[in-house]
Design a protein with these regions (language model features):
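Alpha-helical interface subdomain recognition
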Residues: 1-66
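Short alpha-helical functional segments enriched in proximate histidine and acidic residues
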Residues: 15, 19, 88, 112
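Short alpha-helical linear motifs
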Residues: 31, 84-87, 125-127
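Internal helix-loop-helix
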Residues: 39, 43-99, 103-108
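Glycine-rich, Trp-frequent "lid" loop and neighboring beta-strands that shape
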Residues: 54, 97-143
Length: 143
């Protein structure tokens, strides 16, 4: 295993594992673990260096997910979704959106997540099968 994986595993043993049983039993989000992930810089792992991030890629992302999931599947999955959301913002977001969201990730340790599902298509969040009808007073969504 790589040095990065070993460091992520050490982090997980110290900051995720102590909360794992409780968050699973209470069906809760791993708040304390995520606070520590932010402080340690994991939220900005895949943010390009020119935007203030660590500029790492999929290898480091997958190693962090694997290490975190070894202590808690919940923490590993939630962390993975943060980076999925972040990669979509970086690839498809407007410059205005990128500047706002990425700045919050880098400077304020914000993490991202989806609250999304589309009937019959799973979570194809960047190419939704939905139609918007704009009227004078409202937007009607169908799909």
């Amino acid at each position: 295993m790589s040095i990065f994986y070993e460091e992520a595993l050490k982090f997980a043993n110290e900051h995720i594992l102590p909360y794992a049983k409780e968050i699973d039993e209470k069906i809760e989000f791993p708040v304390e673990s995520f606070k520590e992930m932010g402080k340690a810089g994991y939220f900005k792992l895949m943010v390009p260096t020119e935007l203030g991030g660590l500029g790492k890629g999929m290898t480091e992302h997958s190693e962090a997910c694997r290490a975190f999931a070894k202590s808690s599947a919940t923490a590993g999955l939630c962390y993975m979704m943060h980076n999925v959301c972040l990669s979509i913002v970086l690839k498809y977001g407007s410059e205005e959106l990128k500047n706002k969201i990425v700045k919050d990730v880098v400077e304020n340790n914000k993490f991202l997540g989806f609250a999304y599902s589309e009937f019959g298509s799973g979570t194809n969040f960047y190419l939704p099968d939905i139609k918007a009808e704009f009227t004078a007073s409202e937007v009607i969504l169908n799909g």
